[in-house]
């Protein structure tokens, strides 16, 4: 049985969240009555309001109104007044992933999983399917620049979704195709240990039906280890690894555009398909790898090489994924969501490949718990930056941990051999410091999952005011 149109008014608690807003938008576009609430106004809230969705700012029991179904994310605590009121009324309370799963039942579904690269890969798969005329429905964990939103309703038979592994609920998603970009020891507060993370991703792939398949990155040791353990399901491997079914190679840079070749080898028939000179308007081998995952999916769905090449060449990127916010005195300023050492290292390596000058990295650590558990990795992930500015930790509601702070990170980075790491007192100090460092041709890359995105947006103007230009 699929979800009927007669479920009544659906209320989203925390509707402005990047995951919740996409589901609410698609549900609204399907003709369901949708409303919601959020702690504060935001771009996502404004966008949904413009579509006619009623949204209250602040959480109060009366916000429920005539709601018959309530959707919550894991960020909503049990003492939320709207959640309490919903349970007092005996209303069905649905987790975000459960509602996403219900939407997926209306389409053939592609779910993109992995501890890093999900959002970009989801966007790339959507872009290629668009270029192939498949007009997919998309629910992503980031704003796709080509759409100006993180969700869109397509008329085609395919849906592309980002599968969030953080709370284990991605195992509820009924995917026909499951992509795994990588597996790192993240979200151990939920899983308890890394073995449980490994087991979850294996289950994610084995959950696909017998007529579906998994698409797994052979370059990542944990994913490669999992490939041999997948039982009774079809698997397509991708990556730079010479053993991959879909292999990228001959990577070169044309300015900030990655140019590369892809070789597709069919195991059963021995057929080899060569796609040469693919162009992706993003730097970085990690982005080439993500693009190769999208190529693997698109080619298996029957897309022609010309459409694949067109889709990659016109890819508009994702908001907060190496997004140019402006320029000053010949230096380019970028905003990036990277907040894990693996992500930071990949972004800075990509910047190094594309930049003719020096790299100035500005990082706002996100959560004391993450900085504590990955402290050594954070100390060694900035090597491609010439100068590092470390801002105070964005706590995200956490309590401070003794000895775990930004100054300690700066000291550790220096102890590990970096020549120029500095503590940045806060956003008010950013422009004055950068104005003394940045030179024509340099890249200033702001990295983090907290408020640093606002600093990146404001920095070009603040620098111009300092210089009087």
Curated annotation (Swiss-Prot):
Q: Does the keyword Cell wall biogenesis/degradation apply?
A: yes
Where is the secretion signal located? none
Subcellular location(s): the record lists: Cytoplasm
Q: Does the keyword Cell cycle apply?
A: yes
UniProt record, GO biological process = cell division; cell wall organization; peptidoglycan biosynthetic process; regulation of cell shape
Q: Which Gene3D superfamilies match?
A: Mur ligase, C-terminal domain, Mur-like, catalytic domain, NAD(P)-binding Rossmann-like Domain
Binding site residues for ATP: 114-120
EC code(s) of this entry: 6.3.2.8
List the catalytic activities from the record. Answer: UDP-N-acetyl-alpha-D-muramate + L-alanine + ATP = UDP-N-acetyl-alpha-D-muramoyl-L-alanine + ADP + phosphate + H(+)
Gene Ontology MF term list? ATP binding; UDP-N-acetylmuramate-L-alanine ligase activity
* Cysteines engaged in disulfide bonds, as pairs: none
Its pathway, per UniProt, is:
Cell wall biogenesis; peptidoglycan biosynthesis
Q: Name one GO cellular component term.
A: cytoplasm
Give one Pfam family: Mur_ligase_C
Please state which protein family the record places this protein in. Answer: Belongs to the MurCDEF family.
PANTHER family tied to this protein: UDP-N-ACETYLMURAMATE--L-ALANINE LIGASE, UDP-N-ACETYLMURAMATE--L-ALANINE LIGASE-RELATED
Outline what the protein does: Cell wall formation.
**What's the protein here called?**
UDP-N-acetylmuramate--L-alanine ligase
Gene transcribed to yield this protein: murC
